[in-house]
């Protein structure tokens, strides 16, 4: 086991604070509308230019192992805030730095670290409760666009495209961000349920100009097995021939004689038909077939629940207004399933997604939920260069997370104003001693830090701006973008409550742990032994001998 180096008390805290400051100082320059960029060196390709706090934090690794421990703990704050709300990473880092700096000063002055932590925790609990009372619902498109704009560093086009996407696919809908081919941002909306399975035979195509199959008001047969014997399908086909309506088959596979007969029937015009493979694999395929059944008002024909294909009737089939099948995917538009059942299925999938421990499973469940709830929107980010593309895509993703958080828990006045108002409303808290009281003061003072940093980044005197805002009331604050004071909500400067809450909670949690740290243990760096180097030399000599042959 390698030898360890141990630091105690003030020596440990000084090193830890130095690491915290290096990371926080690099991150906090990005805060606010006039925040600066940070350039990150990459081992290959062009350097990355970003204003995303968590991206900067993740890059920082310090040479001194004890300073690095401090930096890594603050990095955890940024990562946690990013995971919980998808934004607010810089705010969380600024708050953590403020609490740690003041907390360690108090510890050095002889105060009890545990009591300081208890005081900080009490202040944060009171602040979170106060934030909830200040929070306002964010439901209209204009407010959603404003939240997206602020999070995307005042880029109105990003805020508007996200608001449009949410309007089209609903608040629960899936919105994905991709790299586009154009210079401008584009929005593609896929209405209805789409899955990545195309037609099983090109002979089903009835729209040669687009190379697709389009069926109007079709019946939809859902089968959880392979179909190879046409006799199993005859009762359904005979019933359909009388109605004159088209048929779409979704099965594990359709092959051999069954597929050949369907193609012949289709080409002769006896029955208009198309077949596709069911989406997914294993249990996910069964679940997705059930989703389609609920969406279209049909039944999945599966032998494991006692249903046989030969005995299926038209009543077992689902229906939809329209189906479009291309070489690669299938879209079912306006399924005729009961809205009550669809809503119940969405709620069931939502619970599964919340309980899932796998990110991949959660993503797939959210995708299924969106397909049932109304559709999928794809934002294609446009830019002139690859460097700009990466930076812009990160901003769009941040803005998307922020708008989702705003819809979930509402919004508060932005620009650091909400935390100032919260701090002013917290009166005398019930504390056990003076040290806990000082802990409360540390937390309340730290809540000014985001506003002060926004003002500093805008080139203003932080103390003057903070006093002006504190002397105001309600949503009165400082708009650093246009350098004016006024009502933040009217000026469209909003922060999602969830983002502000998460930043405060995670910052105080990690900062509390750092304040109560009394010792740090790290590996003693090992010097390379001379014997090892000699061994390498011998090997090289052997290679030289080989070269002489």
Swiss-Prot record:
Residues that bind ATP: 30-33, 51, 87-91, 415, 495
GO molecular function: ATP binding; ATP-dependent protein folding chaperone; isomerase activity; unfolded protein binding
Keyword Chaperone applies: yes
Superkingdom per UniProt: Bacteria
Pfam families: Cpn60_TCP1
GO cellular component, one term: cytoplasm
Gene3D superfamilies in UniProt: GroEL, GroEL-like equatorial domain, TCP-1-like chaperonin intermediate domain
UniProt keyword terms in alphabetical order: ATP-binding, Chaperone, Cytoplasm, Isomerase, Nucleotide-binding
UniProt GO BP: protein refolding
Catalysed reactions listed for this entry: ATP + H2O + a folded polypeptide = ADP + phosphate + an unfolded polypeptide
PROSITE patterns, per the entry: CHAPERONINS_CPN60
Subcellular location: Cytoplasm
General function of this protein: Together with its co-chaperonin GroES, plays an essential role in assisting protein folding. The GroEL-GroES system forms a nano-cage that allows encapsulation of the non-native substrate proteins and provides a physical environment optimized to promote and accelerate protein folding.
Family per record: Belongs to the chaperonin (HSP60) family.
Complex formation: Forms a cylinder of 14 subunits composed of two heptameric rings stacked back-to-back. Interacts with the co-chaperonin GroES.
Name the record gives this protein: Chaperonin GroEL
């Amino acid at each position: 086991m390698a030898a360890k180096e141990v630091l105690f008390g003030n020596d440990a805290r000084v090193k830890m604070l130095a690491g915290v400051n290096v990371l926080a100082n690099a991150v906090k320059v990005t805060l606010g509308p006039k925040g600066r960029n940070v350039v990150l060196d990459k081992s290959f390709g062009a350097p990355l230019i970003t204003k995303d706090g968590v991206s900067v934090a993740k890059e920082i690794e310090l040479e001194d192992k004890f300073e690095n421990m401090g930096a890594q703990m603050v990095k955890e704050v940024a990562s946690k805030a990013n995971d919980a709300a998808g934004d607010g990473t810089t705010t969380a880092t600024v708050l953590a730095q403020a609490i740690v700096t003041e907390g360690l000063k108090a510890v050095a002055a002889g105060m009890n670290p545990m009591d300081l932590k208890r005081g900080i925790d009490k202040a944060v609990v009171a602040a979170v409760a106060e934030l909830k009372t200040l929070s306002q619902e964010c439901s209209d498109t204009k407010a959603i666009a404003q939240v997206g704009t602020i999070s995307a560093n005042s880029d109105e086009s990003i805020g508007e495209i996200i608001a449009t996407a949410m309007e089209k696919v609903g608040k629960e809908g899936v919105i994905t961000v991709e790299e586009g081919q154009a210079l401008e941002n584009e929005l593609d909306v896929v209405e209805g349920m789409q899955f990545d399975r195309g037609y099983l035979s090109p002979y089903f195509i009835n729209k040669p100009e687009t190379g697709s199959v389009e069926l109007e008001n079709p019946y939809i047969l859902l089968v959880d097995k392979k179909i190879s014997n046409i006799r199993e399908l005859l009762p359904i086909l005979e019933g359909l021939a009388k109605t004159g309506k088209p048929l779409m088959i979704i099965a594990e596979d359709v092959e051999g004689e069954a597929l050949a007969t369907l193609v012949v029937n289709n080409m002769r015009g006896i029955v208009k038909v198309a077949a596709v493979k069911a989406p997914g694999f294993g249990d996910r395929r069964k679940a997705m077939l059930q989703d389609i059944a609920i969406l279209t008002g049909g039944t999945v024909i599966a032998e494991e629940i006692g249903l046989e294909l030969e005995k299926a009737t038209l009543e077992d089939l689902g229906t939809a207004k329209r189906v479009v099948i291309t070489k690669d995917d299938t879209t079912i538009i306006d399924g005729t399933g009961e809205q009550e059942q669809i809503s119940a299925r969405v709620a069931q999938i939502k619970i599964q997604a919340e309980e899932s421990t796998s990110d991949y499973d959660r993503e797939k469940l959210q995708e299924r939920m969106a397909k049932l709830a109304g559709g999928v929107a794809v934002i294609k980010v446009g830019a002139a260069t690859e460097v700009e593309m990466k930076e812009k895509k990160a901003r769009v993703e941040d803005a998307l997370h922020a708008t989702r958080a705003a819809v979930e828990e509402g919004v508060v006045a932005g620009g650091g104003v909400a935390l100032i108002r919260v701090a002013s409303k917290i009166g005398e808290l019930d504390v056990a001693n003076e040290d806990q009281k000082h802990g409360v003061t540390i937390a309340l003072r730290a809540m000014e830090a985001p506003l002060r940093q926004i003002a500093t980044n805008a080139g203003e005197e932080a103390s003057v701006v903070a006093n002006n805002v504190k002397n105001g009331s309600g949503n009165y604050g400082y708009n650093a973008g246009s350098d004016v004071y006024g009502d933040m909500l009217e000026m469209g400067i909003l922060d999602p409550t969830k983002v502000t809450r998460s930043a405060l909670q995670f910052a105080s949690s990690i900062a509390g742990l750092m304040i109560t740290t009394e010792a740090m243990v790290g590996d003693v760096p090992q010097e390379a032994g001379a014997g090892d180097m000699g061994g390498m030399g011998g090997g090289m000599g052997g290679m030289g001998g080989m070269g002489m042959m």
